[in-house]
Amino acid sequence: MAEPSAPESKHKSSLNSSPWSGLMALGNSRHGHHGPGTQSASSAAAPKPGPPAGLSGGLSQPAGWQSLLSFTILFLAWLAGFSSRLFAVIRFESIIHEFDPWFNYRSTHHLASHGFYEFLNWFDERAWYPLGRIVGGTVYPGLMITAGLIHWILNTLNITVHIRDVCVFLAPTFSGLTSISTFLLTRELWNQGAGLLAACFIAIVPGYISRSVAGSFDNEGIAIFALQFTYYLWVKSVKTGSVFWTMCCCLSYFYMVSAWGGYVFIINLIPLHVFVLLLMQRYSKRVYIAYSTFYIVGLILSMQIPFVGFQPIRTSEHMAAAGVFALLQAYAFLQYLRDRLTKQEFQTLFFLGVSLAAGAVFLSVIYLTYTGYIAPWSGRFYSLWDTGYAKIHIPIIASVSEHQPTTWVSFFFDLHILVCTFPAGLWFCIKNINDERVFVALYAISAVYFAGVMVRLMLTLTPVVCMLSAIAFSNVFEHYLGDDMKRENPPVEDSSDEDDKRNPGNLYDKAGKVRKHVTEQEKPEEGLGPNIKSIVTMLMLMLLMMFAVHCTWVTSNAYSSPSVVLASYNHDGTRNILDDFREAYFWLRQNTDEHARVMSWWDYGYQIAGMANRTTLVDNNTWNNSHIALVGKAMSSNETAAYKIMRSLDVDYVLVIFGGVIGYSGDDINKFLWMVRIAEGEHPKDIREGDYFTQQGEFRVDKAGSPTLLNCLMYKMSYYRFGEMQLDFRTPPGFDRTRNAEIGNKDIKFKHLEEAFTSEHWLVRIYKVKAPDNRETLGHKPRVTNIVPKQKYLSKKTTKRKRGYVKNKLVFKKGKKTSKKTV
């Protein structure tokens, strides 16, 4: 099959000749349409003096000004993105946010303090007691290595910076690199102007800022840069067929694998791109060289990450890439045979080869899956195809808020006007299709599906939405701002008609030709009126202004609040800081034994280990479902049953989060049903979810609530002494502001626990587990008497009406005294 040339459509040519491509789209210096080398035939004959040397000479050329302006716009986009992510640092302080970043910070601190080798072999004894955790083989180390390397470089240059500050500002710094990689990718797909718009969009869009604010030291902060840069290098590889660009793509993919588990998206999207190109009969040597090199080298590099290991050749998530690689080799071999066999021989060999290959692949996959060599889809990936699978079979996956389906409001909240313009950009790419635009179309369609299934994957949709929206805005500006420039600067070409061009020998009578009258159909298209252009341009600029305002507002109010520090605002605008979390963790650090074991729900494990430096039973790694279910069973059981579990796990303290006083909705009572469901999955005989609902199927904490709920350990620890508290005169004592109900069990007493600490706003409550008594008290039966059987003994001290009797009491008789007279 002939190799298709890169399609340059008529539409693309018009884009490259517009002034929007030069300034507001700045895109055509790389195509050479307006470069200094384009000269007419007459001007080329006469030599012209060369341009002046130096900086002024470079800037006198159009390409020089375009490069300077492009650099300035990218720098301003980086600066705007970095600045908009600093709200949390300005309002609060330089602090690590959320839950997972605390483990990442703790690991990075260990790496910076003890070195890379010690980090790889680190056994964390403060996690998952009594099991522990081997950290080096269970994490993606790219984030820690990046922060540690930056910290080492700064200290080598005698710039003293604490590792915490490096971790806090790492994600805002990488947001600028993400803008640059998005610019490069969009420029390859369309033109430079669309790339600049895409860089500005992704710098401030809330969908990306949500995971890259200052303090959000998580894998996604650097992974989106690696994702976009890998895609850029892949598109470059497909366009050029160069092994150099493919090797660069493999190195970027290796960094992506080391940084985030979302690398699976890359290793499935790139094979899908190659497969669709084969279906569209767009096979070429460029595609063969790019994918063959990428798959082999990328496979070997990805297996160097300890946490990944042999997964690329033994898990179902990676089998599509292997299948496309085999298909591509077979396709290339058939192309080779097609040039060397007759048509009849090729058809016979083709059908025979396809049948044998399909049967061999089918049987091999069945055999390897049946024998267990190829692992099935993991629960988290399987839930992407069956959205109800996790809630039924693996409730711990469904309990994470990031794994819930995305609402329609979230799309507008995180993307704003880009949601509306993104389909237009996709249509432009499909209308003027080529190899790289097939890739971005597949990227967009797959990202939309995954973002609709899981809230967390909105992060992978945001970059492609910014790219395609930039293409849409770029086309609008080209059409409405470039119309006058096209008419003022018509292309330099001969005015003769096509017949004159075909027959240059007849040009001697050209001057005597009579021009035909131009009909209505032959008249050149008139430009748009100034009113229409002004209205459309102002409308587009207003939309962009509204987008910028929305992004700033969302970043400031929704995504710049650290979860470990809460804030509330009074009617006069003053702010109240609720620092209960750090207060409680600091109390644990200062007032408990260094080796004390703290039991809490898994959400707070990383924070307890990071801030309190105490041993936890479970944490956010969630690798051992049975261990988490055991903690959930203890929280869901009554005090006596829970005490046995806590004693078996050597628990010293129990920590719960309670938001009934301040109205905090993320407390443990609202998470309690997930504890019950996870515990029921492992202990169905002891824990049943239906026991915690009323007969009407309601989950209530008031008097109408289930007796099982009102007497479980979580309920008692949350509401202990709360029934005595009256928050205001309008509500009764024990009124829960979060659930808007008066609690049903106010007389709560503990036998095996005692309150150790309650934070200022009752947000964090810590209980100490009592040691077992040396001698257990025995329950005595009531004493009985011989007079009245089975009657309780009553002493004189308790009543004056009834006398007690002494058993076997001696009876004395009064004797007679003898008189003297008788004697």
Swiss-Prot record:
UniProt-annotated site: Important for catalytic activity, residues: 211
Gene3D superfamilies assigned to the protein according to its UniProt record, in alphabetical order: 3.40.50.12610
Top-level EC class: transferase
Motif segment (DXD motif 1): 98-100
Modified residues (N-acetylalanine): 2
Position of sequence motif DXD motif 2: 218-220
Pathway info: Protein modification; protein glycosylation
Record's compositionally biased regions (Basic and acidic residues): 517-526
Region Disordered, residue ranges: 1-58, 487-526
Residues glycosylated per entry: 613, 620, 624, 638
UniProt site (Interacts with target acceptor peptide in protein substrate): 100, 402, 671
Topology Lumenal: residue spans: 84-170, 210-220, 258-262, 311-318, 369-407, 454-457, 550-823
Protein name: Dolichyl-diphosphooligosaccharide--protein glycosyltransferase subunit STT3B
Organism: Mus musculus
